[in-house]
Every structure is written in C-alpha cells, then in structure tokens.
UniProtKB/Swiss-Prot annotation:
Name this protein carries in UniProt: Type-2 histone deacetylase 2
Amino acid composition bias (Basic and acidic residues), ranges on this chain: 186-195, 608-620
Keyword Flavoprotein (UniProt): no
Listed Low complexity bias regions: 15-69, 165-176, 222-286, 326-351, 540-549, 561-580, 1491-1616, 1677-1698
Polar residues composition-biased segments: 70-81, 134-153, 315-325, 1649-1669
Biased composition (Basic residues): 372-382
EC number(s) stated in the UniProt entry for this protein: 3.5.1.98
UniProt-listed SUPFAM superfamilies: Arginase/deacetylase, FYVE/PHD zinc finger
Amino acid sequence: MSTNNIIEGDEDTKTTITNESNTDNNNNNNDDNKNNTENTTSPTNNNNTNDNDNNSDNNNNKNNNNNNSQVTEEQQVTLEDSGSEDDINFEEHELSDSAEEDEDEMEDDDEDADGRQNQNPNSAGGKRRGRPSKVQQSTNTHLSQTTPESPTIFTPDGKVPKRISTSTNNTPNTQSALKTNKRPRLTSDEEKDLMLSEESDGGVGEDDDSIMSTNDKPQDENQSNQNQNNNNNNNNNTTTTTTTTNNSNNNNQNLNQNNNNNNNNNNINNNNNNNNSNNDNNNNNNRPARGRPKTNGSRSEERKRIQLQQYIQATQGSSTTTSDPNNQNNQINQINQNNQNNQNNQNNQNNSLGEEEFGEEFEEEEEDMGQPKKKTKYKTSKKSVPNHLDIRPCWFVGCVKADRSLKILRPCLIPTCKTHAIKSEVRISEALRRGDFVNDESSGVKDKVCGICGDKKDLHHCGNNGCAFGFCNDCVEIAAMKHNNHPNGNKWICWVCQFVRTKAKEKERTRWVKEQLNPGLTSISRKFRRGPELDMAQAQFLQQQQQQQTSPNEKRSSQFNSNNSNNNNNNNSNNNNNNSGFDPSGSPNNQQNQKRLRKKINASSDIYETRKYTKKRNDEDSAPPSPTSIIGNSVMVGSSGAAGGGIIKNTTVVVEQQGYSATPPSPNTLMVQQQQQLQQTHQQARLSQQQAQLQQLKALQQQHQHQQQNNGNFNNLIESVLSPNREPLNPIDNFVDQTFTAVKFFSTLSQNPPDEIKERIDNFVDLMMRIKTVRWASDYGLVWRMIEELSNLIKRNLLSSQSVVEMYSELKSLEEGALENMTTNARNVPLERAITMVFENHETAGLIGKECCSTRNALIYSIEVALRAIADYQHDLEDNLMEESLRSNKVSTEIEQIEHQIKANLDEIHKFKYQEVELLDSLSKVRGAIAAHESIRDTLQKKSSELKVDMLLIKNGISDKEKETKSQQATLENEIYALKLLITMVESIYWIHDYFYESRVGECEKLINNKLSQLQNKLETQIPHPPNALDNAIPNTTTTVMGEDGQPVIVPTTVDIKNKFKTIAIYHKICMQHKVPNFHLEKPDRIQVAVSCINEFASNPLVDIFDNPPEVDMRYVMAVHDANYIKKLETSLPPENSEFETHLESDKSGAMVTVASHKDFEGDDDNIYDTFVSHRSIKAALRASGSVCAAVDSVSRSGYTRAFCAIRPPGHHAGRYGRTSDAPSQGYCLINNVAIGAKYASLTAGYSRIAVVDFDVHHGNGTQEILSGDDNFLFISIHVCDEKRYFYPGTGQDVGDIDEVSGQFDGNILNIGLKRNTGSAVFLQQWMNKIIPRLEAYKPQLIFLSAGFDGHKDDPTNGLKLNEEDYFVITKMIKTVAFKYCKGRIISVLEGGYGIEKTNSLQRCVNSHLKALIEDTDEEIHLANISYGHFSETQETAIPKFNINNFISNPNKRGKKNNLNTINFINNNMNNINNNITNSLSNKQLERQKQLQQQQQQAQQAQQQQSPQQSQTIENTSITTTTTTTSTTTTLSTSDSESNNNINNNNNDYNNNNNNNSNNNNNNSNNNQPTNFNSSTSSPILSGNNNNNNNNNNNNNNNNINNNNNNNSNNNNNMNTSNPTNQQSSVIISDDMDDVQTNSNPPNPQYPLSPNSVNRGNNPSNISMSGAQRSAPLIISPKPSNSPNSPSTSNNNGTPQNINNSDN
C-alpha cells in the first residue's frame, strides 16, 4: 500500500514527491522544513493546509510516468504553464497589500519554526541548516519505502500534534491554489529555453528544481526513475504522491478498472497504459503550506470571505450553469448532500486506515527479510545537487533567509528573501518612473540607483556599454563574495553580464522594464492581485458545480472518492477564478490564455500503475485472507476542514480483500483502533463548523444578488482612479474616484487658475490620499448614503459639464458664413441643445451644493457620534482602571498572605537545616553550593553598594558643577549689565563733550585766536628766517627799530608763510587685472594713462607715490553693501582660464543674471547689461577700495593733505544691492569705492561731516542711495540729466536747493542736472552758485571727489562740452573750501573718463586735475595760514551763557534725556564755568587798563631819558633778544613725518615767572592756574569743578610749567627766567581783552562756531590744534617795548601759553 504525506513549510519550499510503488524517492532541499511527519499526523489539524498550492509550479518535479503517451512540446509548455497561471493571476492583489502580508508572512515564518521544532522530536536541538549525512540519507530512504504511516497518531497524553495529516490523494487545495506563487510567469519560448538549459546544466538554480520530462526517456527508464533531492534540514523524509490528471472520462475508466481488480484506489499514481497520445500530462504537486491554522477572526480569513464572493461571481460569469441566480438553491442542496456523505463515510474511515497500516507493515517486513529493491542506472542521474550560488543570508543586513532572487537580476542569482525582494523591486520601479533607473540600456546611460537594494548611493557601474547596472558598496560586498568578482575599475564587467555570456540566457531586465511600463501585458511576468481563497464549504459548492457537467462514470467514481473528484474539479474552478482576478480580454494574448484555461477545465486525473505496485497487488491477491483485514468494503474517509475554514484533505482508502490472511497485523493497528472514537468526535465538530460556513455562504450569495440588482454586472463596477485594478469596497472609494475625476476634468479647463483654486486642488489631492489609507471599523450608514448620492450628483454634473464644453466648442466652430446659409431652425438646433445642457448643468450644480451641505451635516453628526463613542470608551477605560485597581489591591493582599506563608516556610527550612548534619555527603555539596551562591550574592551586593556610592558622588559632583555654572553665569550677567552701563556712559559723555566743545570751549579758543592775531599784528620786532624756511617768502610784516636820530623806524621783514602741503598718489597693478572685452570703454589702459600722469609729478618733493595698498577690510565693505550681494559677487566669477567674460547684473536680492548683451557705446545706454566680470575682478575691486581707505589714513594720520587714487573698476553706480532700483544696470561698477572710503573715515578717523562731490558726467546713483539720509555725509553731484531719461542712468533730477523761506538747505543730497552738450560757462556757473555755497554752509571736515573726466568734449560718451581747464578750475574751488574748513584735506578718486585712444582726453584732464591738486599758489597758502595757521583778526561778541535746553539738540542722534543726575551735574559745572569766565574777564579788564597806563608812562620816560647811542645799543640788543626769543617762542608743530624743522612744544619746559605784585590787588588766583585745551577732532571733555575760587589745576601733555613767584613790587613788566642756566626764554604776551569786551560786532556767518573751526575758545591756556600740516614753523612776533630795558612785553597775569599743534 502507498500513502502520501503532505509536508508543510514556507511558501517557497520545494515539495518532494515520492511514489513508493514507483520507487521515486525525493529528498527535498527544504532548508526551512524541520518537520518529521512520520507517525505524527492528525486529521484534527487539516486546516493547516490552508495555504497549500495544488497547482503545479515551475519549481516542482514532474513525475509523469505515462508509458504509452507521447507529449508534444506544445503540450509540455501547457503543462509548465497550467499551474503557474492560476497562481500568478492573483499576485497583483498580494503586491498591493504587500505591507500587511509581509507582516503576516513574518509571523507565519515564526509560527512555522515553532511548529517544526515541536513536531520533529528526532531533530538534534532543532537544527535548521546543514545537509544530512550519508547514513541519515539512507535511513530516510529506507523509512520512506518501508515504514507504514497511520493518518493520525496521538501522543501519550492524548494531544494532537501541530502538523497535519497524510493524504493518499493529491487533492487540489482550493484555497491554497489561490495562494500567490512568487515565481514569475514565463512565456512558452522562455519556458522551453529554461528547461533545456537546466537539463544541460545538470543542476538547478536557487529557485528552480530540476524539471524532468518523462517524454525524453525510454519507457523502462520512466518506470524505474528515482529522483533523489537532498533535504538539508529535513532529517526524516516524508512521502507524497502526485496526481497526474487526464481527461475526466479516462480517469473514471481507470477508477473502474481498479475497482474490478480489487486494488486500493487511494494510489492514484498508477500507470495508465491506455491513455491517448494527445492527453495533457499534468503533475500537480502539493505546495507546502506555511504558518499555523488561521482562526475565524484573523485578517486572512476576512480576505478569504471577500475573495470567495469574487470567485463565485467570476465562475458564474464564465459558466452558464453558475451564472443563473436561480440555481443557487440547487447548489446549496448539493453542498448539504456532500456534507451528509462525508458524515456517513466517517464510520468506515478507521477500518480502511487500519488495513492501510497492515499493508505498509507487510511491505516493511518484506524488505527487512533482505529482498533487494529494483534500482535503475538512472537513479541518481537527475539528483538535485545544491547549486554553488546558494549563498545565505539575504543581502539585507540582519536577514537570515534567502530563498528567492531578484527578477531584475536574473540569470545572476542574488540571495534574498520575499520581503526584501518585493521592497527592492518596488523601489527600483519608483526609480524607473523618476528616470533614475534607465529604461533603455542601449543608450549608454547608467543607473542612479543600486540594482539590488534600489537605494540611491555611490555606485559601481558595469563597464559594458550595453549594461546600465550599478551596485552600492554594501551590496557589492555580498555579491562579490558570492561570485568572486570584485569591481576593479571602469572596465569591470558586472555579474549579470557574465552570467548572460556563460549561461547563454536572456537578460530579465528588459522584460521587467516592459512589465513596469506596460502592466496590462500577460506575456510579461507581473504580480497580479491575489484571488479569493475558499474555505471547505465553498470548495464543496464549486466541486458539485463541476460534477453536474461530468459523465455517469465520473459520478460513479466520485462515490468511491468524492473528495478526489472534487479536488480535480477545483482545478477547473481555479481556472475560472483567474478570469475574475485578472481579465485576459485586455491582453494581447487573449486567445492563448483562453486556450490554456480550456485545457485546464477539461483536464482530469489519470491513474498509472507501476510494475512494483502491480507485482505487489498480485502477491496480495494470491495470499489467503486475514480475519483482521475484513473491516469494510469501499469505505471512503473524508476529513473536512477544522475551525476557520480549512481545506478539505481526503484520505481515501479502498479495501477490497476476500478471505483471511495468516500474516499477523502490525502493532500500530491496535493503536489505530483505539483512536477511532476520538477521530469521530473531531469529525462531528468539523461537520458543525461546515454548517456554520454554509450559512455564511448563503449570506454572501444574498449580498451578491443585491449588488447585481443595484449595480448590474459585477464586472462593470466603478474603476478606482488610484488603483485601477482594485474594485471599490465602500462608498468612500466611489466618492473619491468621482470627485477626483471631476477635479481632474475641471483643472484641464483652465491652464492658470487662481492661486486659491490651486491650493484647494492640492489640498483635495492630499486629503484624498489620506482618506484612501483609512480603514473604516464602524458603520456610518447615513454618511454612506449621503456620500453615494453626492457621488452620483458629481458624476451627473461631470457629464453635463463635459457636454456643455463640447457644445461650446461645437458652437464656436460654426462660422458666421455657415450660420447665414443655414435656415432658422437649423441654426437654433445647436443653440437649443446648448441651452438644455446649460440648464441641466445649473440644476445639477445647485443640487450638488445642497447635497454637499446635507453631507456635511451628516458628517458632523457622525463625528459627534464618534466623539460620544470615544467618551464611552474613555468611561469604560476608567471603569476598567478602577477594576484593575481593585484587583491590584486584592492581589497585593494575596501577596502579603503568601509572604506570610513564605516566612512560615522559612522557619521550617531552618529546622530542616539542623537536620542536614545527619545527611550524607550529597547534602554537604548542596550546602557548599548555597554558600557559594551567598558569597556571590554578597559580592554583588557589595558591588551594587559601591556603584550606588559612586552614583551619589557623581550626583554631588554634578550638583556642584551646576552651582558653579550658575554662579559664573550670574557673574557674567552682572558684568554684561555693567558693560552695557559703561556703553551708555561712554555715549553720554561723548555727546556731552561734543556739545560743550561746540558751545563753550570753541568760543574760548576762538577768542584766544582772535587775541593772538591782534597781538601778532602789534609786534614790530624783526624776525629773521629760520634755517629751514623756504626761499619764496613774501613781506607781510614790519619791524620797528630805533634809527640814528633816535626815532623809531619801521622796517619791512619777510615772514615764511610758504608751507609744505604734501600730496600722495595711490594705485595698484591688480586693478588692471579686471578684464573686459576689447570693445568695452572701461579698459585697463585707463590706469596706465593715470599712472603716467602721476609719474610726471614724481620729481616734486611734495608728492609721494604708493603702489601697494592693502585690500579693504570686509567689515567696511559690509557696512556699505549687502552681504548677500558680496557673496553672490564672489561666487559668480568665471573660472581662471576662461576666455570669455561674464555679464553681471543683480537685483535687490543679490541674485546674479548673466545676459549675452553689451552696452551701446556709441551714445545712449540703450542696452542695460553693460557690466563685465572676470576671474580677478573681485580682487581688483577690493584693492581699489583699499586704496581709498589707505588715502584716508594718509590724510588723517600720516601728514598728507591731499590724495589721488588711480583705481578701477569705478564704483559710484554700485548701490547697496548692486544695481539700484531706479537704474537699468550697474554702469561698469562692482562696489562703491568712495562710499566705502567715506564710511571708513567716519568710523576710524572720527569725522562727523564728510562731503562727497561727484563731477562725473553720469549721476552717482549708487553713492546717493548709500549716503542718503545720513547727517554725517553730504553728497553733491553735477551731471547730465534728460527729462526723458535717455542719458544713463536716467536719475538725479534737481534736488537739495536752498529753501527761500528758511534760508537752509534741505537734506544731505544736492543734485544738479545739466542738459546734454552743456558748455563750460553753465558748468562753472553752477559750481559758483550752488556747489560752493552748499559746501560753505556744510563746513566739511573731509572732502571726497568722485573725479569723472567723461564730461570732456572729446570723450566717447558725448555728454558735456568741457575742457581740461574746467577741471583745473573746479579743483581749485574745492581746494579753497578745503583750506577754509577741513585744513585742506581732499581725497580724489578716479571714476569715469574713457578718451584714451584717439583724443587722449583722459590724460589731459588728469594732468590738469593733478596740477591744480598738488601745486599751491601763494594766495592758497595765505588762505590756509589765515584759516588755520595764523590767527586772523575776527571779532566776536561776548561768550554766550550755557543753556541746558540746548544740551541735546537732536534726540534721534544723541539719545534721550533720561539721566537727570548727569544733566544736573553738567548744569552745575557749566554754571561754575560761566561764573569763572565772567569774573576772569572783569578782572582782566581792570588789569588791562592799569597795564596800559603803566606802559604809557614807561614809554614816555624812556623817550625822555634815552640818548642816540643808547638807542642804537637798545636796538641791537632788542634785535638779538628777539632772535633768541623767536627760536624759543611758542610754535605750531605739524604731524608731517618728513619735516625735520618742526618744533614740538609738547616736551618743552616753559619757565614762566609769575610776578605777584603786592601792590596789585586786582590779581585773581585764577591767573596762576593754567587751563588745558586740546583742539583735536575728537575733542576732550571740558571738565570743571564746584570751587568758587576757580582753581583749575590742569597740567598739559609733558609740559612742565614752573611758575616762580618773584616778589618784585617795582618791575612787573620785565620777563624773568627761573633758571639762569637755561638758554631758552619764554615770551610773555600781553593779553588785551578790552578789544574783545568792547567789540559789539555780530559774528561772521562765514566762520560759525563748530568743534573743528579755527578760532576756538577765549582762555589763553594750553591749546593743541589739529590738522595743520606744515613743515615750517609759524613765527609769532612779540610786541616790542618802548623801554630800552624791556625788549619784550610781559603779561601781568603771568599766564603761560603752550600751543601744541598735533594731528589726530
């Protein structure tokens, strides 16, 4: 007898089929199958076969032992394709739910592992991998041939093992037939190539078992063929049989033959010698199932019920018998009859099983007796040898399974598992849609994603031009280790290309790409949706549908083996189901698919007999009968599915024996008889479950009928937009599809809808995707109805809208001529149709609005209901928590009781310990172990305590660090607060100093300068030239000497007023590296012209040339320009070796624009893209700005008066963001050099009034944008400005003129626009009328010139008609203002001027400008001496009183008056200063009157007593004394580093005799205390005290003033030296304050009071003047005395004067 054992494993496990009668022993290579099903099968676990696939896979062995049949190649292809097609049709469904099924499969794999470990007691430690040894293989072969198996073996404790039972029939598994087969479907030609290549290779791949075709072998070889496949981990091989299906008529005849011969009909693998030659030979192998049996509540069971409905509808649609709804009752009755037959046959099941056991035992004893088995020479010819490519684990890190390969890489097999293979192919499919995965490899483009994992990483690409594969590093490590081919450069050939060459196979990549691009083609392997899976009752229902079409012979055979015929019919039903899972009508291979389906429907099982089985049967017939063998006749045992709707597995045993046999029964027979009662109990439970499933089937049928009534044909349901192959399951899907279709149509009506509509469309798509992912667990009936109605309305509206659009296009297409030729009725037809459609559209739109409102209300109501449900759930949760708390209290009470019991037990344990002494040595070992564990416990406790201590120490350290950190933080915060206060104090004291220096100290300095100038004019003593004076001196003073006649004679003397005002010229050679095209005007040759002009003045000693200025600090560049603009400018330069320049423009955001255009250089600037940049342009621009900053340092700190910067590129058109908003371009400019220099001067040198004069022919719009609104700067520009803005840049209309009402200028911008081709007269008139007065009113401290010489009449720009003499004149005008107000400080920066080729106008203009700038006339020098060198006789009124209201004139600039204490302090000090000044003036006035009287008296006495000789002696003495005195007089030192003749009075010691006349009571103590003033640009603070005696003890810088009090009451006018050895003598200048006090003239408006004005203050004390750059000292002539004994006058006040002239 033969039995078939069904072994369950993973989905891709290869099932070995062994026919004991045919001696085909197959040892499977199943790595994951650890089950030992020998003697451990149970009918109670038949539901474990739910996932078995009965269709033959391409991976299964084909054991077609048909001796007389000849199978053609076409039939063989059909054989190969028949099983896989059923499985593939439903793979698409599985792919859509891959995420859920992957989780289920992982859980099933874990459950399978547990089940296999429990089931296989003979496996050593549950080992999973490894090949069995030769001994184990032989043992397995012996057991598979001789060991009988009972269908159900129970364990001694009465439990049933987890794995499932045996089956003598290859029953088609209806549900598992619908299980997904991951093997890709191949076409006929591909399958033939695959079979031929595998047979020629002699082995199998990782996914393909050896495919053996019996047609290629002799008849005898087919009978004795043995396929031995090594099963690595299956220690006990199980035996199964295959069912070779044939036509149904032949199958029934064979069954009848077997019955007449009294053989066992359960052996279905008998050879049929009478088969026709055209029969299809199918070998349907049972694929092993995976996982534990599913329960009714699992997700897979829910899917099965849904799939059942689809399957029934599909079969009804393809069969006339099942499509009629009236036949449903007949079908149900047939199912009931089948259930009753199964229940009746249950009683006879055990007898057949027992007889089967007996037969198997007899066969085992026969072989034990030493009878050899027949073996053929082809036994191991097709032995399945493990492939050398079988590498594990999976390429995914951490995955241990590898039973698959990526379809995209075949024939190169990369080990992977199902989960990661699907995920990888999904990622590669997405990359294919994005374009990262190449569609056509012949293009030579390489992939951007890995061909194994699908990730976008760094790839190693194949060197073959026809291969686009690339692999990442992680995947290369595994694949290279497998194939021994590491990437070694650009010529590396990948593994896929190698295997294509060696195996001569086709690449799978092209087919896979076509599948993804054309998913509807059935010839391309693709994953279809999984079809419905059927439970037991549904399978029987479909079986009886097929039985109605069978012949009477089949019906008779089905009485013996109903399950067998049902299973054969299930194959046909599976074929029908394929039509529902995938519609082949849309495929180009429709006829071929229908042909295959028809073949499968007509196919049936054939029974074949082998020689061994025939011989064995004859031996059994000749043996005498046995009493124990007569148990029953033709008993059919059917086992139905268990709970959860398992698949029916029938174990059919037909026992027909006559007589008795002397052979004793096997020992297992008794065990089988004892288990019959338990089997009947389980069978009854299954029948009850079948009844319940029958009720479910009825409900599904009713639901199906209802859907057909509502929706018509099931196959014509609405197709989902997001998943076209998926049928909508609820109204939400229908609603989403209808709305999406409507939105998609409406969006096509307008190409540019409003932004609001676009946003709504985007939000709609986002919401639609979210709703599609929601799984509705609750039933919202009202919402569903409203949604369905709204969907229908939307559909109607969409149709009507489409019709309206079509009608509109139709009406629009009609031409007027056609309408005129048509009749009235003909013209009205389309109009009436359009009106009708519009009316219907409006009506539908109104209904949609109402329906939307009602749907919204229904949704709100449903939300409220859901919220109430949530509240109920929360309430239930609270109740559960309360119950759990009560339970926990109860449990805690029980725990306490248990602990009490434990304590009692411990006491008893102690008692038993006293008895341990009396025990044997074994007890001592126990005590030793206890002691050891206790020591370990103590050690661990000690370690834990130490760790706790360490943890506490760490916590303490952390707390200390936190405290320390907080304290430091608090300290830093206090310091920051203090620094902020200091900043506020510094700002306050600065503005206080600024104010008082302007209001008080400046007045005092001014009065002192006026008085000194008066005294200078009164001195008549001749002063010779100093050694270093210049030769060109002019006589401007006279000296009074005594003549021979004793009368005073006035002699003219020469005083050196020719001062050295030095000029510095700055340029850098990098400025020439700013490259522009040859046609451009702003060329590097302009710098060569300017430098050549500078070199002409190199011989002048007053001119210095500096050719290496540093780059400007980027901080000052950022103070002028936007940081983003500078960053874009630095990153937008062309490469270093580029032959082309780049056009550069920018908007306000700093974005660069490159345009292939250039400026029209012949005249107007029509084209706006005129600025070019090269690789070194930014370096040149930074050096240019650095030159201007170096000029500021030279003028402010290095003793130079003027500076000229020959730089490029120009900058006065560059605004804060590059191009200004009102200009068309940047006008050749990159960064604004003049603006950067002005900001630099303001920030570093402390200038508060800086004037920028731009006389370029183009308006300096960039400089105006940067400096506008800042009171520290004044910008003046004279340029060409047309009304129509034709001339570049079109900006700079007249602005900034004086206000006629207020007489003041408005703002800090003065623009003077000239008409084009204006001449010199108008140009110079504008300078005299507007520019010079504006500068006079502003009184700048520093002047910048944007020197643009493109206004010349010969310049290519043709803007103005000026000459080079005009630039000479305006430069002289600027110098005049500079000498008057800013000590001659001028910085000239080259801007425009492009006449360098023909006219050479630039050279002439620069020469004129430099000549006027460098060479000083006598009038200019005299103006400089008057302005800030000599003391002019300006008469001012009395010093004004201090007013606290004028303390802060501009709150926005100087801050708010928020510190009252500071204001009060300053107010008190200034009041004291006012009082001191008033008292000092009054006292000095009285003293002056007395001194004048005394001098008059002394002069009269001297004239009367003096003789002619004495007069000559006195004259010589006075001249000598005067000469000696002038060498030591108070001089004004300059900061010129080159002048060696400067006299620095900072370190001079003035020994002034303070003559305290005891008779003079008018001397004030204030006269003995000098007051220090420093008149630098950054003025110090005038500090006073509250002393009413006005004692100001201030010492000057390193000046030691020794006032010796000589008590000389008689001669107060003599000058006395305190140190007789000192050769120097000081000049005591009489202070005449009467002229100042009596002068009532108003102040001169040309010399207003300012911190930097020349005449500062009235207190004759220590004065430090800034900004006078002179190499020769100015000599102050003392006033001669009329007395012969008094060559010089003396100041009665004894106030010394130390005049220190230092620059900033």
